[in-house]
Amino acid sequence: MKLAIRIGGATIALLLIGVAGLWIASNRRDAGRMRASVEIERAPEEIWPWITEPEELTQWVGWLAEVKPDTTSPAEGIGHRETWVMDDPRARAKMMVPGTVTLWEPPDHMGVHVEVPGEFSADVLYTLTDLGNGNTRVEQDGRYTYDSRLASLLEPLRTPGNMRKVFDDMKRLKEKVEAVPEDPNQGVHDDDSTSTAPADSTGR
């Protein structure tokens, strides 16, 4: 009997320690923050469509089955709204993730506010830094907060797995972008007096 009481007491103590550890970790300074970056051998102008256009986004964002633009919002820029349809194989149903553009400075910065009622909200910033010689550093910095206390408590357990997905996505972005032949007209200006033909200004 005494042994059973001791085992039960030890189990409860371990559970309390675990919960306390999760609570402390979930209240750390960078709780819910997910950052990743990758260097891509392309100019920012060539990468920009890959983080803004539905056809390109579905090629590198994991689980993204479809992007549904809100036709009542601006076609692009601040205030543009769209919904990402996420098909997580671990989930029983697809998740609709609506987002609104909050910052639009092509081809350098884009900010998006995401909010799934009852689940989470996030602010994600994409930064494209021109490194010269046709190279760009792409950074994704997201800060997520969860609506329920339980989800917030379990954040330290969820974030590492979510981070692995973000890193995989960035790696896939690099592979997809660099697989496309480089645009020879990037960086060519019409006022170049030595050019025998005008530069194509229609390329994205």
Predicted segments, located by residue:
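Extracytoplasmic/periplasmic, Sec-exported soluble proteins
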Residues: 39, 49-52, 93, 120, ...
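Juxtamembrane/transmembrane-helix boundary motifs in multi-pass membrane proteins
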Residues: 1-2, 151
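A short acidic/glycine-rich loop-to-helix N-cap element
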Residues: 144-168
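Hydrophobic ligand-binding cavity/cleft-lining segments
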Residues: 3-7, 11-71, 203
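Solvent-exposed, polar/charged alpha-helical surfaces in well-ordered, non-transmembrane soluble domains
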Residues: 45, 49, 55, 164-167, ...
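Glycine-rich portal/gate segments that line the openings of hydrophobic small-molecule binding cavities
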Residues: 5-9, 39, 69-125, 133-137, ...
